[in-house]
Regions:
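Conserved Class I S-adenosyl-L-methionine-dependent methyltransferase catalytic core
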Residues: 4-10, 15-48, 58-59, 65-188
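Alpha-helical subdomain
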Residues: 1-82, 184, 189-363
Length: 363
């Protein structure tokens, strides 16, 4: 599915333009942030034909100079287009371009922008150092934790909102298609490892009236899951167990008919993934189904989706843990099978964001 990486058909002049976009990327990102936060993007988006710099500046109580430089940068990166005027001396009239439309209206783009701005931007400044030492040094902008997961509940409110918005936007959209696959074998006891806010557990309980879900997560996170389950009246059907899967002394409980991990294994290195799955194997029976839901960058239908996943890998490098990434199908599957499992099913293009749902059993 990633044939677009085997061909380089870009004309030289277009390739040079792409290079300039990279050169000025920090400025264009900040320009878009300003256009959004100052209301300029929305103002131009609501007016089809008559958005002049003067009108926008007056409406938003901003200087014409400030609005002008931002609008001109918006032209350069495709956010805005100009409306032709019969009078050459008439002021330029701006309208929303196709790129601007997605920046203003597309929920996925908003989620990615907020995540980049609120979670990644400041910490990514010294990426070279992170690559060299294998530690998420950028996390220091928020706290002194070894990984971001230890401090999720303590992140600043805006960063926390953007982090969970990013995490849930993608995986949640795959849930409706994933549920029938997972419940085909009618599990009575399902373990959700890394269950975060209990969204999957709640979805399972609403889908199947007989299932009990046990959420295994870090001690600082399970209180959030418990509160959300209680709000839905599901405290009896959703239980929690504090587990740090990287602790060499930790164990996964026995008794699960199905084990679920959604956007969880990408939080770990390949060797850590194998170690985690070995713990699951020790607790599993021959009929335990292990489900892994992940967006794999080499299984994407669109180049933009693969690009977004590759960029997300850098978040893991500089902010999350310093050693994981968004994986390819083969490398993730091999890491799981190295723990003594065998791939039984692979469902790709699950949900509108092209997730892969993999089912494993003990060899």
């Amino acid at each position: 599915m990633f044939d677009f990486y085997f061909n380089d058909k870009l004309a030289a002049v277009d390739a040079k333009f792409e290079a300039q976009k990279i050169a000025f990327a920090p400025l264009s990102f900040q320009a878009d942030k300003a256009l959004r936060n100052l209301g300029i993007l929305e103002e131009i988006g609501h007016h089809k034909k008559d958005s002049t710099i003067k009108d926008i500046a007056t409406k938003l109580s901003l200087s014409e100079y400030g609005v002008g430089v931002l609008a001109e940068m918006g032209l350069g990166i495709g956010i805005f287009k100009l409306i032709p005027q019969n009078d050459e001396k008439a002021p330029l009239c701006y309208t929303l371009g196709k790129v601007g439309f997605f920046l203003l209206k597309d929920e996925m783009t908003k989620v990615n922008l907020d995540f980049s701005e609120d979670v990644c931007y400041k910490g990514a400044e010294n990426l070279i150092d992170f690559i060299k030492n294998g530690k998420p040094e950028g996390l220091k902008v928020f706290g002194t934790w070894k990984t971001i997961y230890e401090g999720l509940s303590k992140l600043p409110d805006q960063a926390k909102k953007s982090w969970f918005g990013f995490d849930h936007f993608y995986s949640d959209l795959a849930f409706p298609e994933a549920l029938p696959i997972v419940f085909k074998n009618k599990p009575k006891e399902l373990f959700d490892i890394g269950g975060n806010t209990a969204k999957w557990g709640i979805a399972c309980c609403k889908y199947n009236p007989d299932v009990h879900v046990s959420i295994l997560d870090l001690p600082g996170q399970i209180s959030v899951a418990e509160a959300n389950a209680a709000k839905e009246g599901l405290s009896r059907r959703i239980s929690t167990k504090p587990v740090n899967v990287l602790d060499p002394n930790s164990k996964v409980p026995e008794g699960a008919n199905a084990v679920w991990m959604s956007q969880f294994l990408d939080c770990f290195s390949l060797s850590e993934i194998t170690s985690i799955l070995q713990k699951i194997r020790e607790a599993a029976s021959a009929t335990t189904d292990v489900y892994v839901l992940e967006p794999l960058w080499d299984k994407q239908r669109f180049e933009a989706a693969a690009y977004s996943l590759q960029a997300t890998s850098l978040y893991f490098t500089c902010m999350a843990n310093g050693n994981s990434k968004m994986y390819r199908f083969e490398e993730l599957t091999n890491a799981v099978e190295d723990a003594g499992f065998e791939l039984k099913e692979a469902h790709h293009d699950v949900g509108i964001n092209s997730y892969s749902l993999l089912r494993f059993r003990i060899k």
